[in-house]
Amino acid sequence: MKVTLIAILTCAAVLVLHTTAAEELEAESQLMEVGMPDTELAAVDEERLFECSVSCEIEKEGNKDCKKKKCRGGRKCKFNMCVKV
């Protein structure tokens, strides 16, 4: 009787662990598909950095101050670079 009970509990524990692992694997694969690839994120960051560095290089013309372009995405232009605020 005890052996049967232990066998049933062991099988149940293995089944629960297997199901949990399968769900985690499925969730990870869905996250990888939905997200933006790293290369696209890097291109967006490089574009923002370029825009900011170009706009920060604008100098005064006569008595008028040139307005710098603002960085997008919650970033500010500091030291000729877009930095997160």
UniProtKB/Swiss-Prot annotation:
GO terms for cellular component: extracellular region; host cell postsynaptic membrane. It comes from the Eukaryota. Residues 23-48 form a propeptide. GO terms for molecular function: toxin activity. InterPro entries: Hwtx-2-like. The keyword Ribonucleoprotein does not apply. It is found in: Secreted. Residues 1-22 form the signal peptide. Postsynaptic neurotoxin. Belongs to the neurotoxin 12 (Hwtx-2) family. 02 (Hwtx-2) subfamily. This is U4-theraphotoxin-Hhn1q. It comes from Cyriopagopus hainanus (Chinese bird spider).
